[in-house]
Curated annotation (Swiss-Prot):
It holds the Pfam family LCM. GO terms for molecular function: methyltransferase activity. PANTHER family: S-ADENOSYL-L-METHIONINE-DEPENDENT METHYLTRANSFERASE YKTD-RELATED, S-ADENOSYL-L-METHIONINE-DEPENDENT METHYLTRANSFERASES SUPERFAMILY PROTEIN. It comes from Bacillus subtilis (strain 168). The lineage of its organism: Bacteria, Bacillati, Bacillota, Bacilli, Bacillales. The keyword Methyltransferase applies. GO terms for biological process: methylation. S-adenosyl-L-methionine binds at residues 134, 163-164. It comes from the Bacteria. Keywords: Methyltransferase, Transferase. The keyword Methyltransferase applies. This is Putative S-adenosyl-L-methionine-dependent methyltransferase YktD. InterPro entries: Ppm1/Ppm2/Tcmp (IPR007213), SAM-dependent_MTases_sf (IPR029063), SAM_mthyl_Trfase_ML2640-like (IPR011610). Belongs to the UPF0677 family.
Amino acid sequence: MRKNESSLTSLISAFARAYHSRYDTPLIFDDFIAKDLINEKEFIDISKNMIQEISFFNKEIAERLQNDPEKILKWVAQIQLSPTPLARASYCEKVLHNELILGAKQYVILGAGLDTFCFRHPELENSLQVFEVDHPATQQLKKNKLKDANLTIPGHLHFVPMDFTKTFSYDPLLDEGFKNTKTFFSLLGVSYYVTREENASLISNLFSHVPPGSSIVFDYADETLFTAKGTSNRVEHMVKMAAASGEPMKSCFTYQEIEHLLESSGLLIYEHLSPDDINDLFFSNRKDNLSAFETIHYIHAVKK
């Protein structure tokens, strides 16, 4: 991401969560705060943009639904935009709540974007410290949006501005009160935008300052990322959209490569969800177009 730009992917992800909360049923993940961070003008502008791009996504759907923009938007949201942000957030927060029961005291959200966890769970203010780590421009955008939405930043939420994929340092976290205690990390929608070497370095650095039992949930793209088409060519479209937005996808892994990367930093895979697993867990028995995204896997790994 360029220095003075906030992340387009954060806006699109928040839009997808807001759209799902408003218009889909049953809900995979209810981010009822996201709509407050995407103002009405942004919601309309992003909606219009997606509707206008329907020919890029699917020419047949563009023709069939040419007189029904709302159905076009629903198709784009459910096929292209929403599946991964919804399911990975649902999975991550389920794991987090289990980790809290097991004694985690800190939650570090890497690439937090417009995450709303703290605002949806005020009951955790006295038991969990939350550190949002992201590019300074993205954090400033979020702070502005929180102010516009009249949302007060809770006392347990700490903003840590850092371009962490390039140079990770614990110093800014320590300055915000981070302690050497059991910690849960999330790294969602990030791994495929950085190189293999940057992923390995980041994981190694993250777990150098936390005790055994600390863990991480992240998603990664498998080795078919740059060759798979997916439903309605959506995998190919995802790769092209990322490149066009200035945040190209850079890495993909086999399961064995991810396992080796984690083992090198002293982590064991506790749970791995393949696209089929994700589909069974989060998208079964639906009557709409939502389904797990091909090529994207979820991992929960724990420090030995």
